[in-house]
């Protein structure tokens, strides 16, 4: 299903897909119509979107569709698209890079660095063209956001292709550990905090049960890497630097086991049936409970020895016998996406 983003008159918002940052200036309406390893395709029906394409691999496609045309980035660069539905126009601005614009009948036109063209209708009629002379307030805001990303400390330790890496800078600190290499310590003020405790579970196809973290920095550490406890502190361990990290819905193990349905189970002190889980430690194997290729499994479990490894015994996980790391919830709260999960007493 498409992801839709609505922006009000004075609002600005930011989306990331791989190496590309999309920023909207209201009022705007944007649908993400395709997002996979090779394609980021969005549809802008009104308003303004800026696209910063940091890297473009062979076979990769970044496309912005409007009611009048389609814009495809030919190389890394900075692009801006403005749609006026009442005038039936799309303005294409290329601050750097180069883009090909396609009309309804297959017509095409190239827009190069510092060029700006206003296209009328679906046949690539040109209403106005020229060289870019100045940047407005939105362009300046985009440039400031790009500068922050350029200076990101977290980008030294994880790939920019990892969604959510930008939030790590403001909410924690990086360090080097002799056992794990680069680790990230979140700034935590909750006394009983543990990974995968403050948030909720949601059923998301095709992954199945997926962890949705409450923390603004929670996406990357919930879906990539592993967790360790170094002294009294929790540390996120991203693992070996990979150009394209592999997503997982939640890198946890459940007490009692389980699959795409909640077949795992424990008995809570109240007599209710419940679910319990804990984070995987560095080097521990995660087995997808949805269909996944051997290559996906290898890339997901790329710690140390690159050879295939069998799934470990259910009682061999490091955090399984450490109650402070285990989180529990009654089944009705788990299935209902309730945030009231807790540590066992």
Give the role of each language-model region:
Residues 1-101, 105-116, 145, 151-152:
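Flexible, surface-exposed loop/linker segments and immediately adjacent secondary-structure boundaries
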Residues 118-345:
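Low-complexity, repeat-rich tail regions
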């Amino acid at each position: 299903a498409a992801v839709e983003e609505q922006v009000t008159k004075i609002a600005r918002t930011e989306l990331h897909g791989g190496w590309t940052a999309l920023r909207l200036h209201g009022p705007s309406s944007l649908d993400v119509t395709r997002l996979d390893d090779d394609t980021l395709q969005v549809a802008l029906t009104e308003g303004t979107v800026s696209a910063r394409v940091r890297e473009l691999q062979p076979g990769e496609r970044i496309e912005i569709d409007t009611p009048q045309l389609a814009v495809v980035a030919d190389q890394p660069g900075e692009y801006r698209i403005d749609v006026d539905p009442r005038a039936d126009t799309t303005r294409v601005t290329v601050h750097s890079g180069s883009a090909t614009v396609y009309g309804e009948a297959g017509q095409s036109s190239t827009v190069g660095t510092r060029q700006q063209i206003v296209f009328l209708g679906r046949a690539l009629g040109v209403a106005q063209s020229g060289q870019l002379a100045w940047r407005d307030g939105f362009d300046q805001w985009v440039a400031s956001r790009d500068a922050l990303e350029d200076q990101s400390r977290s980008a030294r330790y994880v790939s920019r292709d990892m969604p959510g890496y930008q939030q790590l800078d403001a909410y924690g600190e990086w360090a080097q550990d002799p056992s794990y290499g680069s680790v990230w310590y979140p700034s935590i003020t909750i006394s009983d905090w543990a990974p995968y405790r403050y948030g909720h579970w949601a059923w998301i196809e095709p992954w199945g049960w997926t962890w949705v973290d409450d923390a603004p920095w929670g996406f990357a550490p919930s879906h990539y890497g592993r967790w360790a406890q170094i002294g009294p502190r929790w540390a996120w361990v991203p693992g070996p630097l990979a150009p394209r990290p592999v997503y997982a819905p939640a890198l946890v193990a459940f007490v009692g086991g389980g699959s795409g349905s909640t077949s795992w189970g424990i008995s809570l002190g109240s007599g209710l049936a419940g679910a319990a889980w804990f984070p995987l430690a560095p080097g521990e194997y995660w087995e997808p409970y949805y269909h996944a290729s051997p290559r996906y499994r290898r890339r997901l479990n790329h710690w140390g020895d690159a050879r295939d490894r069998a799934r470990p015994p259910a009682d061999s996980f490091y955090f399984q016998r450490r109650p402070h790391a285990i989180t529990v919830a009654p089944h009705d709260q788990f299935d209902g996406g309730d945030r009231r999960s807790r540590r066992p007493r």
